[in-house]
From Swiss-Prot:
Entry EC no(s): 3.5.1.2
Keywords: Hydrolase
Binding site residues for substrate: 66, 116, 162, 169, 193, 245, 263
PANTHER family, per database record: GLUTAMINASE
Reactions mediated catalytically: L-glutamine + H2O = L-glutamate + NH4(+)
Name of the protein described by the UniProt record: Glutaminase
Keyword DNA damage: no
Top-level taxonomic group: Bacteria
Family indicated by similarity: Belongs to the glutaminase family.
The keyword Nucleotide-binding is assigned to this record: no
Length: 311
């Protein structure tokens, strides 16, 4: 891969996105997110050699929201291994990210770790044996370690905004608790969940944190193994099939990469063996995924030939 080509493609895509009028709708159900500039756009791509191609608002922190679920899943698998799958499934949901319908049919077991119910169950596992502050600190330190940046922090205003308005998540958690899926007090688990979703990162930081998924579980800069190659492959598989909720099929069809979105407008995508990619555009589509983020990634994979399904 030519770094010059990548730099040019990333700059071109940022310029093209700046001209687009179809930006989607900024999330409004979390009041603090509704204040974000809808015209913001950032893109950062980190290659195997550590070269970073960045453009637009790539260094502006934003609320990563559900993208944090990739990292809590990684932590939980490190703690519990395959025992985690007794609490949560691995199938696409086909429903909205905050739907309670399938929990009713499947006795409180969430379909996958990336819908809200699944991520709450994963958070509960991380919390077990810890105080909420300790569990949250572990998650934040893990993110800082992966990104190599201790300045990454939680946006308390966003966390409090979610706590004040997160009634659907409270319903999901209480419903799972009634089936014995959650071990800890619901308010503790939700507190940790709301706070890790409120971690703020830039595209550059997020792309750095995701590098291990692009390189068989290893950080290529340090040579340190974060997870085994098998576990990295399986996390990527879940990102491909479940990472964009009921828009996951469309994302796979158009972009062809494992990816995880968040309602803050971010997407973390993985080009295995090639690059870790983070894009941010706050306007969302009907499924709650970044509209221009997906468009930008589709352009990137086409021009670079990065789709996992072929050129």
């Amino acid at each position: 891969m030519s770094n010059q080509l990548l730099d040019r493609v990333v700059a071109e895509i940022a310029d093209e996105m700046a001209q687009r009028a179809d930006r989607g709708e900024v999330a409004s159900y979390i009041p603090q997110l509704a204040r974000v500039d809808p015209k913001a756009f950032g893109l950062a791509v980190i290659g195997a050699d550590g070269h970073i191609a960045a453009a637009g608002d790539a260094d502006v922190p934003f609320s990563i929201q559900s993208i944090s679920k990739v990292f809590t899943l990684t932590l939980a698998l490190g703690k519990a291994g395959d025992r985690l799958w007794r609490r949560v499934g691995r199938e696409p949901s086909g429903s909205a990210f905050n739907s309670i319908v399938q929990l009713e049919h499947e006795r409180g077991i969430p379909r996958n770790p990336f819908i809200n119910a699944g991520a709450i169950a994963v958070t509960d596992l991380i919390l077990s044996g810890h105080q909420p502050r300790e569990a949250l600190g572990e998650i934040l330190r893990f993110m800082q370690f992966l990104a190599g940046d201790s300045s990454i922090a939680i946006d308390e205003a966003v966390a409090k905004s979610e706590q004040r308005t997160g009634f659907r998540n409270a319903a999901l958690a209480n419903y799972m608790k009634s089936f014995g899926v959650l071990d800890n007090p619901v308010e503790y688990t939700l507190g940790v969940y709301f706070h890790h979703c409120a971690i703020a990162m830039s595209c550059r930081q997020l792309a750095m944190a995701g590098r291990f998924l692009a390189h068989n579980g290893q950080n290529p800069s340090t040579g340190l193994n974060v997870v085994s190659s098998e576990r990295a492959r399986r996390i990527n598989a879940l990102m491909l099939t479940c990472g964009h909720y009921d828009g996951s099929g469309e994302f796979a069809y158009r972009v062809g990469l494992p990816g995880k979105s968040g309602v803050g407008g971010g997407i973390l995508a993985v080009a295995p063996g090639r690059a870790s990619i983070a894009v941010w555009a706050p306007g969302l589509d009907a499924a709650g995924n970044s509209h221009l983020g997906r468009v930008a990634l589709e352009g990137l994979t086409k021009r670079m030939g990065w789709s996992i399904f072929g050129v």
